[in-house]
């Protein structure tokens, strides 16, 4: 199958988001689609798969004009889109998820479970993976759930597969498994559109790259004919000389202390963070990093241990108490835990600090609006105004709104869990710069990251976790990818 998108444009009201886009996808090819968040990548793919119509231009499939009315019609034609937030039902089994809305029935109108099992097993065999069809999706790893989504696309004679940030939440082993599956699909003649910000992956598995910026296609070229610096320059319209901006914060007295913390998924965790310091937390998925931070913030219960801020012992049983004590927590899942997607930017940013805008029993909207405007400008949130619905923003701008929410409480300590996950290269640097500015103001920052180059480039010290314990804490001058991974995998 050959897809040609010709002169595609799209406007939402007066806002033009795509202009004169040309894109060609061939069978048996892995085609990277790159660009900053808000460049128009997802909009272009949503037009291709029929989620909404183009304002102009045309789509040809094997030289015939084609317009899909909805994603289901596109899937029936062999074009599947696996979104970053997967479309699965956690309480249903693998088999039920695979055939939801496409159940096979016998001539009596009764579900033909045997036929569905046979078809499901064949799909997984083609992928080279084994998954229990009777297991609930919610009990699978993210990598396994992704394989279910790919298997689902096999049920409709897959010809083109679109993947949006597919490795964002995968372990290293699951990522390698995915790359193996992609290679197999490519050999079977499936065309793959691969949306990612991860340069290493792009150069490892793709054949060609299309770069978008501000709703335009900047360039399309063979992967082997370009390099990281050139791609970054095309994506952001400028050269990023210091990918990790220099940090000038003075590291002073200890502000935050965790002493012998233990809970269900971790034990005997002790560490401290100083004023102006960025303490990184590294480790493999499942090591317990997020669980430690959730307990500190009062989401999960501690079994033992003490938490101190400025030498004062704290009792934190819920997030409201944590916020009252000056702890901010940007969670790893911004869409489910960090934001109310149907609320405005203003409503989201003021959520944890609403009481500060209550005067004589009434909400002071004017003061809140000024407050939000100042924060949005400081973080360079790209939006029409503070009333724009957060769900309509790009991933990078959504992340900035979550950051603004916690900066707005003037935190005594700020916890950031995967702060740049799913964020483009330009927005990443803005987040790093913001972290440096907060550190310069004396805010201690705890940052969890699964991106080793990032944590090495940003953190002053790195605590490495392995199987629920801190395996070691490394100073910046002794931290390398090799010794971090050695500690993370149980080495000494």
Swiss-Prot record:
Annotated ABC transporter domain residues: 3-239, 249-492
Location of the protein in the cell: Cell membrane
InterPro entries attached to this UniProt entry: AAA+_ATPase (IPR003593), ABC_carbohydrate_import_ATPase (IPR050107), ABC_transporter-like_ATP-bd (IPR003439), ABC_transporter-like_CS (IPR017871), P-loop_NTPase (IPR027417)
Listed EC numbers: 7.5.2.7
GO annotation, cellular component aspect: plasma membrane
Quaternary structure note: The complex is composed of an ATP-binding protein (RbsA), two transmembrane proteins (RbsC) and a solute-binding protein (RbsB).
Similarity field: Belongs to the ABC transporter superfamily. Ribose importer (TC 3.A.1.2.1) family.
Listed name of the protein: Ribose import ATP-binding protein RbsA
Organism this protein belongs to: Lactococcus lactis subsp. lactis (strain IL1403) (Streptococcus lactis)
Gene (UniProt): rbsA
